Regions:
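Glycine/serine-rich phosphate-binding loop and adjoining beta1-alpha1 elements at the start
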Residues: 98-197
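A glycine-rich (often HGG/GG-containing) alpha/beta subdomain
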Residues: 2-124
Length: 198
């Protein structure tokens, strides 16, 4: 049973989210990191050159975030996350030290929680903000066009949209539902979502 609730075994790989948002970073840093839609393919190409084969880049006023998936195992978590931070820093013309303490890195279950939270607009400055799903969809479309998505990332993103459908209305009407609705069983929700895709 433990294996069944492990996202690594469910997905045969590792979910990873690296970013800077309104809680982790200054507005000045986020402004420097902001990625216009037309620049996203270049960032995705740099990520691919850095060894990241599945990723989307979500850039809004609240965050700049790379949602990624690594097939199989990851030899060095810190090195993998560092490469993503370096790509973002290069885009923002920032030195790595300027990013220190202003970014977050989530792996596996925590990464999936983050994807779900962002998609459902639970991690926004304004909880339940309806524009977020459109921003996620646009980022997903750009990643697909750049051939930067495959089974692992697609599965997580589809589950995130299903999760959003479950929580978005209650959250918009009562933000106090945030913790109980989102964080109770994200991996079980992912399992159920995968089962409906098979």
């Amino acid at each position: 049973m433990a294996e069944k609730s492990n996202p690594r075994s469910l997905l045969n790989g590792r979910a990873l989210v690296v970013g800077a948002n309104h809680r982790s970073s200054s507005m000045i840093l986020r402004d420097r990191l902001f990625v216009e839609d037309e620049a996203v393919p270049f960032i995705l190409e740099r990520l691919k050159n850095a060894g990241i084969d599945q990723a989307l880049v979500l850039s809004t006023c609240d965050r700049v975030e790379v949602q990624a998936f690594c097939d199989g195992d990851v030899a060095n978590e810190d090195e993998t996350a560092r490469r993503i931070v370096e790509v973002l820093a290069e885009h923002g013309e920032l030195g790595p030290s300027e990013m220190d303490g202003q970014t977050y890195v989530h792996w596996d279950e925590q990464a999936i929680r983050q994807v779900f939270a962002v998609t459902a607009s639970l991690d926004s400055l304004i909880i339940g903000e309806p524009q977020v799903l459109g921003q996620v969809k646009a980022s997903h479309r750009i990643a697909k066009d750049a051939e930067m998505t495959s089974t692992g990332l697609e599965t997580i993103l589809q589950a995130g949209r299903k999760h959003m459908a479950v929580v978005s209305v209650p959250v918009r009407t009562n933000p106090k539902t945030r913790e109980s609705r989102l964080f109770k069983h994200p991996i079980q929700f992912l399992e159920q979502s995968i089962a409906t895709m098979l």
